[in-house]
Amino acid sequence: MTEIEKEEACSRLQQHYAQVLSLLGEDPKREGLLKTPLRVAKAMQFLTKGYNEDPEAILRAAMFEEDYQQMVIVKDIDFFSMCEHHMLPFFGKAHVGYIPNRYITGLSKLPRVVDVFARRLQVQERLTTQIKECIQNTLNPLGVIVVIEAQHMCMQMRGVEKQNSLTTTSDFTGAFEESTTREEFLNLIGRRR
């Protein structure tokens, strides 16, 4: 999306958010809300900017040949996303591991991949799988594992209203299908089951 397209989209979003405020019984022209439609439009563009980014290109930009075939883990990756069902935030930590098969990537690239997929309207299950598949398809490692722990505002602010609930998802390929390899990963991230 070009800058002009982004500005046009922001302007249209701003108009729609002003209408939403009116439909909720608010006056979008009152002092406290004058800039709210623009702020919300910009926030939504930021929170969904992952649609305009290529996560595989991020990994390929720092892909190196290396003779290392032990686990590589980046844990406690903070992320936030938006639930596609209610458009409310969910946030938490992602733990990503892979066992290289000739290629490694820059360590900072794994959190960047998490962010690209998280900054879209999501469900946690799909987010977990998309991260795993991106790493598997790009690096072709011996195995990939992703564990995500998150709090969902759609469960805490509305619906069942369970403030201390935590949702955990995992997905894995290759070498991580072996329970001992998975157990090693879980021990290393401090999530032994």
Curated annotation (Swiss-Prot):
Keyword Transferase found: no
GO MF annotation terms: GTP binding; GTP cyclohydrolase I activity; zinc ion binding
Keyword Metal-binding: yes
PROSITE patterns listed in its UniProt record: GTP_CYCLOHYDROL_1_1, GTP_CYCLOHYDROL_1_2
EC number: 3.5.4.16
InterPro entries cross-referenced by the UniProt entry: GTP-CH-I_C/QueF, GTP-CH-I_N, GTP_CycHdrlase_I, GTP_CycHdrlase_I_CS, GTP_CycHdrlase_I_dom
Catalyzed reaction equations: GTP + H2O = 7,8-dihydroneopterin 3'-triphosphate + formate + H(+)
Residues bound to Zn(2+): 83, 86, 154
Gene3D superfamilies assigned: 1.10.286.10, 3.30.1130.10
Organism superkingdom: Bacteria
GO biological process, alphabetically ordered: one-carbon metabolic process; tetrahydrobiopterin biosynthetic process; tetrahydrofolate biosynthetic process
Class of the enzyme per the UniProt entry, highest EC level: hydrolase
Family: Belongs to the GTP cyclohydrolase I family.
Assembly with partners or alone: Toroid-shaped homodecamer, composed of two pentamers of five dimers.
Protein name (record): GTP cyclohydrolase 1
